[in-house]
């Protein structure tokens, strides 16, 4: 009613009682916000900032550690590759040494077999020559006896004649 009684009031200017109540309500709202809400918001904001910055620092630390581990693994891999190449080269050298040993043993065995074969051939040749001398001598004496018509029974004479004849053949064959 009070408002209706005052009919000549300017609508642009507020009523002073509303202005006082609004100011008190606003001041009370600002006080509650500053006293209770803002500290909690600041605490939550700071916790969020710390979490983000801490997460970034942890991520950077994890990245640095991962890079360090990667470098260690690469160094170990290079070391393992070098060791594998050395082992491979050692194995090749050992294999070549074994190969050379086997070849040397095979050559020695081959030379031994050839020498034994030559010795056996010389022995057989000597035996055959001796047998042939005896046989040829006997045949020659028998044939000469038939041609001459008398027996050449004298063993010493016969052996001397045969040996001279065969030596003459050998020296003629050697020329």
From Swiss-Prot:
Major subcellular site: membrane
GO cellular component terms given for this protein: plasma membrane; proton-transporting ATP synthase complex
InterPro entries, A to Z: ATP_synth_B-like_membr_sf (IPR028987), ATP_synth_b/b'su_bac/chlpt (IPR002146), ATP_synth_F0_bsu_bac (IPR005864), ATP_synthase_B_chain (IPR050059)
The keyword Oxidoreductase belongs to this UniProt entry's keyword annotation: no
Keywords linked to the UniProt accession: ATP synthesis, Cell membrane, CF(0), Hydrogen ion transport, Ion transport, Membrane, Transmembrane, Transmembrane helix, Transport
Keyword RNA-binding: no
A family per Pfam: ATP-synt_B
Gene Ontology terms for molecular function: proton-transporting ATP synthase activity, rotational mechanism; proton-transporting ATPase activity, rotational mechanism
Functional summary from the UniProt entry: F(1)F(0) ATP synthase produces ATP from ADP in the presence of a proton or sodium gradient. F-type ATPases consist of two structural domains, F(1) containing the extramembraneous catalytic core and F(0) containing the membrane proton channel, linked together by a central stalk and a peripheral stalk. During catalysis, ATP synthesis in the catalytic domain of F(1) is coupled via a rotary mechanism of the central stalk subunits to proton translocation.
Subunit note: F-type ATPases have 2 components, F(1) - the catalytic core - and F(0) - the membrane proton channel. F(1) has five subunits: alpha(3), beta(3), gamma(1), delta(1), epsilon(1). F(0) has three main subunits: a(1), b(2) and c(10-14). The alpha and beta chains form an alternating ring which encloses part of the gamma chain. F(1) is attached to F(0) by a central stalk formed by the gamma and epsilon chains, while a peripheral stalk is formed by the delta and b chains.
Entry similarity comment: Belongs to the ATPase B chain family.
Protein known as: ATP synthase subunit b
Taxonomic lineage: Bacteria, Bacillati, Actinomycetota, Actinomycetes, Micromonosporales
């Amino acid at each position: 009613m009070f408002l209706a009684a005052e009919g000549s009031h300017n609508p642009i200017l507020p009523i002073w009682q509303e202005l006082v109540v609004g100011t008190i309500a606003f001041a009370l709202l600002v006080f509650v916000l500053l006293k209770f809400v803002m500290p909690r918001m600041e605490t939550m904001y700071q916790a969020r900032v710390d979490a983000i910055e801490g997460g970034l620092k942890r991520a950077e630390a994890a990245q640095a550690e991962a890079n360090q581990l990667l470098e260690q693994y690469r160094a170990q891999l290079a070391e393992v590759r070098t060791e594998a190449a050395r082992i491979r080269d050692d194995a090749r050298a050992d294999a070549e040494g074994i190969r050379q040993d086997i070849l040397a043993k095979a050559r020695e065995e081959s030379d031994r077999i050839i020498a034994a074969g030559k010795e056996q051939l010389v022995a057989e040749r000597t035996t055959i020559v001796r047998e042939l001398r005896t046989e040829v001598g006997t045949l020659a004496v028998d044939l000469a006896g038939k041609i001459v018509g008398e027996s050449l029974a004298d063993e010493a004479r016969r052996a001397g004649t045969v040996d001279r004849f065969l030596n003459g053949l050998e020296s003629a064959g050697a020329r």
